[in-house]
């Protein structure tokens, strides 16, 4: 029933102040999919549950609903798996940069192997004879190539640099990252402050990064021209921190160092084979250089090349 308070002609409803309760699903997680989500079935319908582990009993809320499946996120863990660990990153529950920090590392590898074997068998119809031991590298600060979103938020008077928040298109406000190169993670707050000071702070949508063991290159995607003071700020920053700035104004052919001192040579080495490969910040390289070295070593041990053989990596 509507009513009109004295002195106010606006109509109100008794239900205006009552927020609808969340519709939570109670689910027992049956297994893990290729994206690290828990999988369950309710009334025959597949539900993919973010943040849930096999064997757990959780309350979850669906946010994507399709005729044949739903995607949900974990609201509360009622019965916890012994493989659940505390995420190392303080931003994990909000930032969408990674999704499995709650899952013990060796258990992650085992789960991924099961998914891989199941895919070979169920989809590829391949019967495996021998399964090699999975390869693994460092679990933290391994991502040496990638892209960060940038957004200047007027209300905060602050430039955000990072990944999208989980389940939104907004950029997560983070001060560090456990998967980025350590040098980049360490300077994230200062980098955000630097972007905030630029005259074109609202004209920089993204930053691509490329790193090796000795250098970190940040390629600023700029939609307007940097003025003299902007260049001074960037040059001063790179002289005080282990970073070199490059810019990209249009297509890939416009990528260039901000100044001659930023024109560094990136490289990665395969020391046991006496090889060192140089690459540019915009070249394709493996995101994880550590696992790449292990892969090459494994491939060479399986190939058993003679001294006259030549091996090509395509």
Give residue spans per PLM region.
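Accessory RNA-recognition modules of RNA-modification enzymes
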Residues: 4-314
């Amino acid at each position: 029933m509507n009513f009109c308070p004295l002195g106010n002609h606006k109509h109100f409803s008794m239900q205006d102040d009552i927020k609808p309760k969340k519709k939570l699903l109670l689910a027992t997680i049956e297994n893990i999919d290729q994206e690290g989500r828990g999988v369950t079935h309710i009334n025959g319908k597949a539900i993919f549950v973010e943040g849930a582990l096999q064997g757990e009993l959780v309350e979850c809320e669906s946010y994507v609903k399709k005729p044949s499946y739903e995607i949900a996120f974990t609201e509360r863990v009622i019965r916890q798996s012994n493989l659940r660990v505390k995420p190392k990153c303080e931003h994990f529950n909000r930032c969408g940069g990674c999704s499995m920090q709650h899952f013990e590392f060796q258990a992650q590898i085992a789960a991924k192997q099961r998914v891989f074997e199941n895919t070979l068998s169920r989809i590829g119809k391949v019967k495996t004879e021998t399964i090699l031991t999975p390869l693994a590298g460092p679990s933290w600060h391994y991502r040496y190539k990638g892209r960060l979103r940038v957004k200047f938020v007027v209300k905060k008077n602050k430039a955000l640099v990072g990944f999208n928040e989980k389940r939104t298109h907004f950029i997560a406000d983070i001060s560090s990252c456990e998967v980025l190169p350590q040098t980049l993670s360490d300077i994230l707050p200062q980098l955000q402050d630097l972007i905030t000071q630029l005259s074109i702070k609202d004209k920089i949508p993204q930053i691509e990064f490329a790193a090796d063991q000795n250098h970190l290159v940040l390629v600023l995607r700029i939609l307007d021209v940097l003025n003299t003071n902007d260049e001074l700020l960037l040059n001063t920053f790179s002289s005080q921190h282990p970073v070199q700035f490059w810019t990209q104004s249009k297509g890939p052919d416009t990528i260039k160092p901000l100044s001659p001192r930023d024109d560094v040579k990136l490289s990665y080495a395969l020391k046991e084979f006496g090889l060192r490969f140089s690459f540019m910040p915009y070249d394709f390289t493996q995101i994880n250089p550590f696992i790449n070295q292990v892969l090459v070593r494994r491939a060479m041990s399986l190939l058993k090349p003679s001294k006259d053989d030549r091996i090509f990596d395509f």
